[in-house]
Amino acid sequence: MVEKAQLMDEKAIARAITRISHEIIERNKGVENLVLVGIKTRGVPIANRISKKIEQIEGTKVDTGDIDITLYRDDLEKIHVEPVVKGTYLDFNVNDKTVVLVDDVLYTGRTVRASLDAIIDIGRPKSIQLAVLVDRGHRELPIRADYVGKNVPTSRHEIISVSLLEIDGEDSVTIKE
C-alpha cells in the first residue's frame, strides 16, 4: 500500500470538526435533546472532539457515547474469525433524542446501517443524523451523511486512511493505493 497524497493535516481536520459542529448546532436550532454517538473505533474521538467544540460554542455539554457494531455487521460469516466485541458505552437514554452518529469515513454505507440497527435496539430516537470526517462515495446502500468534513471522490481500489492523535499519535487523512 503506497501513500498517494495527504488529504487533510491537523489544521484541516480541526477546521472540519469546527464546521461540522456549527452545522449541527444550526440544523438542530441548538443542542437541546441532542446526543452524539461515535462509531468505534475512530468515530469515537471525532465525536468527542465535536462535543468539546459544541460545548465551547454553546456553553452546554452534549451527552456523548460510543457504539460497537461488531455483532450487527452483515459480513461476519465472510471474515471467518471470532468477532472481537469492544462494547457499547451510552450512559444516556436515546429515546426522543436527536442522535448524531459520528464516523471517520463513509464508504459503502454498511457500517452506518449496522449502527442504525444497534441504536434502534437501544431505544427509539426522535431522529438520527450522520456526521463523517470523509465521504469517499461508492455507496451500496441508500445512506448519505448530513454533515461531511471533506468529500473525496475515490476509485474502489484506493483506501482512505484516517489517523487521529488519540489512537495513532497524529492527525492526518491520506489516500493510499
UniProtKB/Swiss-Prot annotation:
Q: Name one Pfam family in it.
A: Pribosyltran
Tell me where on the tree of life, at the top rank, the source sits: Bacteria
Alphabetized CDD domains for the sequence = PRTases_typeI
The answer to whether keyword Transferase applies is yes
The top EC class is: transferase
- InterPro entries per the UniProt record, alphabetical: PRibTrfase_dom, PRTase-like, PyrR, PyrR_bifunctional
Reaction(s) catalyzed by this protein?
A: UMP + diphosphate = 5-phospho-alpha-D-ribose 1-diphosphate + uracil
Q: Keyword annotations for this protein? A: Glycosyltransferase, RNA-binding, Transcription, Transcription regulation, Transcription termination, Transferase
Residue positions of motif PRPP-binding: 99-111
Gene Ontology molecular functions: RNA binding; uracil phosphoribosyltransferase activity
Question: Could you state one GO biological process linked to this protein?
Answer: DNA-templated transcription termination
Keyword Transcription carried by entry: yes
Enzyme Commission designation: 2.4.2.9
| Annotated Gene3D superfamilies | 3.40.50.2020
| UniProt record similarity statement | Belongs to the purine/pyrimidine phosphoribosyltransferase family. PyrR subfamily.
The record's note on quaternary structure and interaction partners says: Homodimer and homohexamer; in equilibrium.
What PANTHER family does the entry give?
BIFUNCTIONAL PROTEIN PYRR
**What is its biological role?**
Regulates transcriptional attenuation of the pyrimidine nucleotide (pyr) operon by binding in a uridine-dependent manner to specific sites on pyr mRNA. This disrupts an antiterminator hairpin in the RNA and favors formation of a downstream transcription terminator, leading to a reduced expression of downstream genes.
Q: Which HAMAP family match?
A: PyrR (MF_01219)
Name of this chain's protein = Bifunctional protein PyrR
Q: Which gene encodes it?
A: pyrR
